[in-house]
């Protein structure tokens, strides 16, 4: 959220959106790569990859098919991890803007992110509840987009631009 407070122009919005997606992709790689590599080794061993003999030609075709199926599974799993990472970031932002709304309305409710009270109060003082509602709507819309197979970068770019300037929603 602190990066969101520093957004100055459209370019900085697009850079932040790309950084969010890049971070999600890097996290997905660190989670998925070891598992993917282990699965590939297992499949190759099961089909006798690297072996010699007449019977291995048929196995080679089966191996190629199994590796293609495995690559498709890996791609789906990696995408799911990326989307889950981005969704968690969006949910965290929803909590932040919920707290902003609590402060703006003077509600007698505890803040979810009390450790961020100074930033929350600064954002609350710099805007109106109507703008905060537009931001929350943008966050909900982004969650929907992420679950609807929209390109993650496009969804995050739209979100960050709207968080910077809710009138663009």
Features from the language model and the residues they span:
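AAA+ P-loop NTPase domains with strong preference for DNA replication initiators
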Residues: 2-127, 140-147, 152-154, 158-164, ...
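C-terminal target-recognition/interaction regions appended to catalytic cores
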Residues: 132-136
């Amino acid at each position: 959220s602190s990066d969101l407070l520093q957004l100055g122009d459209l370019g900085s919005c697009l850079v932040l959106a790309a950084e969010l997606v890049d971070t999600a992709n890097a996290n997905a790689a660190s989670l998925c790569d070891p598992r993917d590599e282990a699965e590939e080794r297992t499949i190759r061993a099961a089909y006798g990859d690297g072996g010699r003999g007449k019977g291995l030609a048929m196995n080679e075709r089966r191996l190629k098919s199994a590796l293609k199926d495995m690559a498709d599974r890996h791609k789906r799993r990696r995408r799911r991890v990326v989307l889950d990472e981005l969704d968690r970031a969006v949910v965290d932002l929803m909590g932040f803007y919920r707290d902003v709304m609590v402060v703006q309305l003077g509600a007698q409710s505890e803040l979810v992110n009390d450790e961020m009270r100074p930033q929350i109060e600064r954002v609350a003082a710099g805007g109106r509840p109507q703008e905060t509602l537009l931001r929350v709507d943008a966050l909900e819309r982004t969650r929907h987009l992420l679950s609807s197979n929209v390109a993650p970068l496009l969804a995050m770019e739209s979100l960050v631009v709207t968080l910077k300037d809710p009138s663009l929603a």
